UniProtKB/Swiss-Prot annotation:
Pathway: Carbohydrate degradation; glycolysis; pyruvate from D-glyceraldehyde 3-phosphate: step 3/5. GO terms for molecular function: manganese ion binding; phosphoglycerate mutase activity. Belongs to the BPG-independent phosphoglycerate mutase family. The active site is at residue 64. This is 2,3-bisphosphoglycerate-independent phosphoglycerate mutase. It holds the Pfam family Metalloenzyme. GO terms for cellular component: cytoplasm. PANTHER family: 2,3-BISPHOSPHOGLYCERATE-INDEPENDENT PHOSPHOGLYCERATE MUTASE (PTHR31637:SF0). It comes from Methanococcoides burtonii (strain DSM 6242 / NBRC 107633 / OCM 468 / ACE-M). NCBIfam families: pgm_bpd_ind. InterPro entries: Alkaline_phosphatase_core_sf (IPR017850), BPG-indep_PGM_N (IPR011258), Metalloenzyme (IPR006124), PGAM_B_sf (IPR036646), Pgm_bpd_ind (IPR005995). The gene is gpmI.
Length: 518
């Protein structure tokens, strides 16, 4: 290794997508003197961050998990969504031994099968196609009592997409003569990932005890009533569906079988722990039925549960290669994106590499981040600048979460503020890097804040809260002259960093360095 311009800082600005559209573009509307200066001064390009270029189905928008996996792996990582879709298509899904055993357990016990997960076509955490494949699998195996616990989205799809989706799904189940929605909860409650256990508790109680915040005679009514309270899909309070006598139609009992069909781990962990961890103490479980619990993918290596689609091992990720070279690394982010710069960036491996330090800055405890668009960016920046000055690290991986997390609110003014906060922080961080003679790459993992509105029927304007499939910026902050970057995809970033540092790219990395040969 002949790299002397240390540290090298990889700055991932979550949700910093590129779009020429002006209307509803918080990035265009914001005052960003620092990012503008970097784009004018240093080599930069656009990277594909969605669809087949990141291992997703064609046209599927990217997300933080997928983005960090591809960036850290230096190759296109075929995602769980793609794998599961493939198995449904070729029939292997219906032979999956873990899923088959779960269904056999329900048959043997004469008990109910509960399917819980994000009720969404978004394809980020789950997909309706997978839920329906499970229903059809169970029906074909003779299961008649199937209850669905629907977690409503409103972030990776339109804020109120669930109502029409639910109407369609109820008709689908009626046609099959099997499958009933037992509970409805916004993902804000059922899929919290920031240790706000009171939210998880509300969802857990609805699912296990039939103890809801609200009760409704049907799932379509439950959603409509939530809208009447001013709640979008994401925030609909846990609602239990009851029969004509007011009794929960799908309360969970001993020996029932549960399949959690989310394939993305980070927002599935807390609720799973509440179900399967005997030592659980984050809230009092008033009911804890012993069930046969199956996870669609591996949510956490500490969870001892059957996994339908185990992780595929990724060898020689960027962090692993740097570790073998004796390079000291720092990973730093606030809570919302900490798992992304550690677990996901390392190829879905929780264990730290040798020589890798981690720094977690707590995210603010607010209901939604539009209430505090700066989140903890300034605290992250202050800590990072101090660590840059220490001279201890060779490579630093940073995530600033604001443009993504505030972008999900759909509130334009808050998103503009988030962009401006990030710009301010980037300016301070790049100044600190230059002062010690380091270099940096400033990029994103997927788009979000560049699209805050959409138009229905070409006329009706509404908030847009999902990610986008737009390309993302990539800037190489260097004093080297005559450097040019070519267009590429996220998986080209790790090979580029290795080339900059004079380290040979391992054969597993199929990405191509972005630096043009001059």
């Amino acid at each position: 290794m002949n790299f002397t311009k240390r540290p090298f800082l990889l700055t991932i600005l979550d949700g910093w997508g590129y779009s020429p559209e002006v209307e509803g573009n918080a990035i265009h509307a914001a005052n960003t003197p620092n990012l503008d200066d970097l784009l004018e001064t240093y080599p930069n390009t656009l990277l594909s961050a969605s669809g087949e270029d990141v291992g997703l189905p064609e046209g599927q928008m990217g997300n933080s998990e997928v983005g960090h996996l591809n960036i850290g792996a230096g190759r296109v990582v075929y995602q769980d969504l793609t794998r599961i879709n493939r198995d449904i298509g070729n029939g292997d899904f219906f032979k999956n031994p873990v899923l088959k055993q779960a269904i056999e357990n329900a048959k043997a016990q004469g008990s109910a099968l509960h399917l819980m997960g994000l009720f969404s076509y978004g394809g980020v955490h789950s997909h309706m196609k997978h839920l329906r494949a499970l229903i059809e699998f169970a029906k074909d195996e003779g299961i008649t009592e199937i209850f669905i616990h629907a977690f409503l989205d409103g972030r990776d799809v339109s804020p109120r997409a669930a109502l029409e989706d639910m109407k369609e799904h109820v008709e689908y189940c009626n046609n099959l003569s099997v499958g009933k929605i037992a509970t409805v909860s916004g993902r804000y409650y059922a899929m919290d990932r920031d240790n706000r256990w009171d939210r998880t508790e509300d969802a857990y109680n609805a699912i296990t005890r039939g103890d809801g915040v609200y009760y409704s005679k049907g799932p379509v009514d439950a959603i409509s009533e939530g809208y009447g309270r001013g709640e979008n899909d994401e925030f609909i309070k846990p609602t239990v569906i009851v029969d004509e006598n007011g009794r929960p139609i799908g309360r969970m009992n001993e020996n029932d079988t549960v399949i959690f069909f989310n394939f993305r781990p980070d927002r599935a962990r807390q609720l799973t722990y509440a179900f399967v961890n005997d030592e659980f103490d984050n809230f009092e479980r008033k009911s804890h039925p012993k069930v046969h619990f199956v996870c669609m993918t591996e949510y956490d290596e500490k969870l001892e549960v059957p996994i339908a689609f185990p992780s595929e091992e990724l060898k020689n990720t960027l962090g692993e290669v740097l570790s073998k070279e004796g390079i000291k690394q720092l990973r730093i982010a606030e809570t919302e994106k900490y798992a992304h710069v550690t677990f996901f960036f390392n190829g879905g491996v929780e264990k730290q590499n040798e020589g890798e330090e981690r720094c977690l800055i707590p995210s603010p405890k607010v209901a939604t981040y539009d209430l505090k668009p700066e989140m903890s960016a300034y605290e992250v920046t202050e800590e990072l600048i101090e660590r840059i000055g220490s001279g201890k690290y060779d490579v630093i991986v940073l995530n600033l979460a604001n443009m993504d997390m505030v972008g999900h609110s759909g509130i334009m003014e808050a998103a503009v503020k988030a962009v401006e906060v990030v710009d301010d922080c980037v300016g301070k961080i790049i100044t600190a890097i230059k002062e010690v003679g380091g270099e940096a790459m400033v990029m994103a993992d997927h788009g979000n804040a560049e699209k805050m509105v959409e138009f229905c029927n070409n006329t009706e304007r509404q908030c847009y809260t999902a990610h986008t499939s737009n390309p993302v910026r990539c800037i190489y902050v260097t004093q080297e002259k005559r450097v040019e970057l070519q267009k590429g995809r996220l998986s080209d970033v790790a090979p580029t960093i290795l080339k900059i540092m004079g380290i040979e790219k391992p054969p597993e990395m199929t990405g191509v360095p972005l630096i043009k040969n001059t």
